């Protein structure tokens, strides 16, 4: 999974410590899961789903800078990612967003944080390493470019899907559960809503 992604992506680079990339990836995921677990306790008890999303958030957060941050930077990126994912999921849920798995929070919010974190923790030019904030501009431009591209292509694809086969299921299918309506079985019986 993510080790192939982060470490494998660095194989094309010259003079990169692949083991260090694996370590920063692991540290950020661990810090993200621990922070998400403790942050999710604001609801009274630790939430396993949030803890797992915290690990993913740590992985997403470290991806942009996995080869350019040290271990402390990786832990700090993971800590922030873990808290961000919990607060973001809760916020979007309260606002009525339909994001059952927290994908916007994990990949969108924590991805933005990870790109900005490079400007802070990059050991060559990051804010904490004498860069004076010079990386913030390029990182922000990258975020805006990626966001514009993702929005435009997603909008186009979703419009095509909606105008052909439809983007939403019926209310009845949603209440019954997509596993039941599409496959005739229930994968997550504990999550069935009874009327």
Describe the residue ranges of each PLM region.
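Glycine- and aromatic-enriched membrane alpha-helices
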Residues: 1-195
């Amino acid at each position: 999974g993510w080790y192939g992604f982060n470490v494998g992506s660095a194989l094309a680079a010259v003079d990169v410590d692949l083991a260090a990339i694996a370590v920063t990836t692991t540290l950020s995921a661990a810090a993200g899961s621990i922070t998400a677990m403790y942050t999710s306790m604001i609801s009274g008890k630790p939430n396993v789903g949030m803890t797992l999303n915290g690990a993913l958030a740590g992985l997403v957060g470290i991806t942009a800078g996995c080869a350019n941050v040290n271990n402390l930077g990786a832990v700090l990126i993971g800590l922030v990612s873990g808290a961000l994912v919990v607060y973001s999921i809760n916020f979007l849920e309260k606002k009525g967003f339909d994001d059952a798995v927290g994908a916007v929070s994990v990949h969108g919010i924590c991805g933005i944080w990870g790109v900005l974190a490079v400007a802070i923790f990059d050991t060559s030019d990051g804010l904490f390493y004498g860069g004076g904030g010079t990386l913030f501009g390029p990182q922000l431009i990258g975020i805006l470019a990626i966001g514009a591209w993702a929005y435009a292509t997603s909008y186009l694809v979703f419009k095509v899907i909606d105008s052909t086969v439809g983007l939403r299921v019926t209310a009845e299918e949603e209440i019954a559960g997509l596993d039941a309506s599409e496959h005739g079985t229930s994968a997550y019986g504990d999550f069935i809503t009874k009327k």
